[in-house]
Swiss-Prot record:
Residues holding AMP: V18, M19, E20, E21, G22, T28, G29, E30, M31, T32, K113, Y114, K141
Native source species: Ovis aries
Recorded name of the encoding gene: FBP1
Subunit structure: Homotetramer.
Cofactor binding, note field: Binds 3 Mg(2+) ions per subunit.
Database matches in Pfam families: FBPase, FBPase_C
Record protein name field: Fructose-1,6-bisphosphatase 1
Amino acid sequence: MTDEAPFDTNIVTVTRFVMEEGRKARGTGEMTQLLNSLCTAVKAISTAVRKAGIAHLYGIAGTTNVTGDQVKKLDVLSNDLVVNVLKSSFATCVLVSEEDKHAIIVEPEKRGKYVVCFDPLDGSSNIDCLVSIGTIFGIYKKISKDDPSEKDALQPGRNLVAAGYALYGSATMLVLAMVNGVNCFMLDPAIGEFILVDRDVKIKKKGSIYSLNEGYAKDFDPALTEYVQRKKFPPDNSAPYGSRYVGSMVADVHRTLVYGGIFMYPADKKSPSGKLRLLYECDPMAYVIEKAGGMATTGKEAVLDIVPTDIHQKVPIILGSPEDVTEFLEIKKYTAK
């Protein structure tokens, strides 16, 4: 006989974890309220994603969002869920969503001190073929003394107090980065709670996978072409890198975090400013990767150092294991001469 119980009676839920962190920092508890509310939305989206075919949520809603992407029915549902739960958390004052042209200003009676930027359903072009998709979020403190406005969201990623993503894959995982590091929580559907499964996650110093859409290779700049060539045909005859690209940022970045390597969505001739959005895609992912010991750059500067000028601003991004990103930057510097 073993003394080990078949059921862990001392589980660490995301609520318990954030409350413990808040107690150490002598916080007000507003962050716990906010993340609890966000988890409620993530659970609801996870359920909707898994029921989408039965509930007729596949297909296009007949509109495009502010960045020109076709809006899917699940996008609309997910956006409404996140907006409503964040407003009712009494912890937010400004919300920025990929799906809304302007920032959402929370009603005075529901306002708190946080600004949240989010992509409610990233990778939604993959919904119909059942590829993993996700929700991305970044949380800032309001720093101005004025009434809440769109300007409160135009902060560099260095000001983030928390960021992360939910991945709706073979299981639903929440990856949360805060000042002390990155922690992963798995949704246990039996009890409806996110359970801590990986504490203080660190990315490998060097990986063996590169990830980008090589369909755009004719528009790559010389540095990127040279880097990819080196990964396929290493000059020192070492093993070539594997190529993995899902086309869903959450899935690609999560794999990079877990296995190491490099993820690239660079600028090219067709998209000189890149295609991914700074506030609710690049900054949160860069924050997660940096807190895990990795690097995130545009090729010219650290993603987290950029001061946004527009809530839907686009930037190039290269992130991942520090040695892999450094190698790319060295090639970039060398080819620019």
